[in-house]
Amino acid sequence: MESREFLSKVQIPPVTQLLVWAPVENKLAYVWNYNIYLKKNATAEAVQVTHNGKVNKILNGVPDWVYEEEVFASNEAIWWSPQGKYLAYLQINDTGVHNIEYSLYGNDQYPTTVFIPYPKAGCVIPRARLFVIDVENPSRQSEVLVPKSVGVGDHYLRTVTWVTDERLAVQWLPRRQDSVLLQIYDYDGTNWKETSQKSKTGWVGRYFPAAPYFAANNMSFYKVMSNDNGYKHLHYVEAGKAKPITSGKWEVIYISKVTKDSIYYVSNEHMGRPGQRNLYNKSGHSAPECLTCSLYQDRCQYNSAYFSLNASFFRMDCYGPGLPLFTLMDNRGPAKGVLEDNKKLEKILTTELLMPTIKRATMKIAGFSTYLWYQMMFPPNFDSSKKYPLLIQVYGGPASQNTDYVFRLEWATYLCSTEKVIIASFDGRGSGFQGDELMHAIYGRLGTYEVEDQISAVRKFIEMGFIDKDRIGMWGWSYGGYVTSMVLGSGSGLFKCGIAVAPVAKWDYYDAVYTERYMHRPEENTESYKNSTVTDRAKNFKSVQYMLVHGTADDNVHFQQAAQISKALVENQVDFEAMWYTDKDHGLSGKARYHLYAHLNHFLQNYTLPK
């Protein structure tokens, strides 16, 4: 590597699934054909350390579809120890997992069929095993066994954290995901400690349990978890006992950095606004210090930070509500430097365009005692004495948040500024970052309160006096498409039209990890599965204009979901509009995205915008 020459195809296979450098020196590991290879340096001969990899059957070092999407949120399943002495890797066994199959049409005479192991609710899930390789002697491998309390049934491996070169911490979850077991493992057998965490009211964590951050003693650790009042806070865990070190009716979002003297974390404590994010420093017994609350106060209320190795510097990333701003901060003094201030974009927005204004506030709805947050985007030169069409932009999934302080330029911005449509979003029951009581309200009953609350919010919006009650629509993507469809199928009479992009139709059709986290298995919760289907509401769509959009190659929310909605609507003699995007996945990228928004504009102009 000192010669700065590119590696040849002989040295690294041309289609490598993953390549991860060791933290020190020039060692690397890569995955090819679902097997792991080690190299002592970039030009050294590769040593194959697994030999059983097989597509859609046995995967070494990379996750399968459901682990990548729902467990790791990453395509990596290799973890180097701090000094590169050991390499831990995940082995996934998908042998018993049923495949989803769909066609890729391409340009050939015959379509290609894609097969992906995809465990649906109630079905066989992948089997996960964790191994550790001695890099100096790759044939020496040991398995990190799942604890008996978890391993007696189906389970998931959630996180792998190297504490030292000789100590490993692993989090395991039972299939139900209402508890987590953190196991600390030492290779010499002197330490084998377990710490358990169980949710009192629902699933554990927001989407999944947070990772541990180890203290200087390499045994105790810091972790974000729910306190006794159901708010996510920092805890110090020592000898299996968790002690809260922050508290209040707000939440710690995540830990950014742990040093010998300080813990840096992001929370939404400031000003009691759950949609804000600020960076804090907690040192010893002193009160937490907010490092970003007073910086660019009007512009920057949604921040994150990335630290240097010893935390002497950090990059402050400000995402709104003003234009994004990226700044290099000196953690030891006042010095800082602007990395990107978006001045050019600011000039365009202030001199060439009329931008909407955004209001964020709270209101009460029937069925819940706490004030809930909404945001509303108003057209330029808004006049409260006039009536405007309203479009609800919804996601609504568990632990989600639509009312935040992030700057966005998106389709909604165009509709508001150009077509004079008010855009509103509402965080009802099931939404996150405001405590477990609100978030877990939909536990075991998706398709209920998060749907009802959107309808209640619209009634409140109408009472504000400037909404044209005859021109109200809703749209959403993925879970938002599901909520849109459930709302339109409720027969409320409030909505003229709705757009559902890549919606779920039935939770039986979606993946087991996500669905069972909130709904358990179908055989354990039959009525809730039955009552949460879009298809059973098909007859109520006769009174609304409905547009259904889906990609035929969606490997996440399968085209099967839209096909079932379409079939139910046809069987009930409901007229609706549909748009299928050939060979496009869940994101509808490329030219399909432009086509989609043009089509959505046309749909709204036909059904919502005209008086």
PLM regions: where:
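Short loop/turn segments that connect beta-strands within beta-propeller blades
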Residues: 2-3, 41-44, 135-138, 187-190, ...
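A flexible loop/linker signature enriched in serine peptidases of the S9 family
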Residues: 12-15, 31-41, 51-75, 90-127, ...
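Residue-level detector of Asp-centered blade-edge/turn motifs that repeat once per structural unit
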Residues: 23-24, 82-83, 164, 216-217, ...
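Cap/lid segment of the alpha/beta-hydrolase catalytic domain
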Residues: 45, 52-64, 201, 347-478, ...
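Non-catalytic accessory segments flanking enzyme active sites
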Residues: 88-92, 97-100, 123-129, 145-147, ...
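Active-site-proximal cap/loop segments of hydrolase catalytic domains
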Residues: 425-611
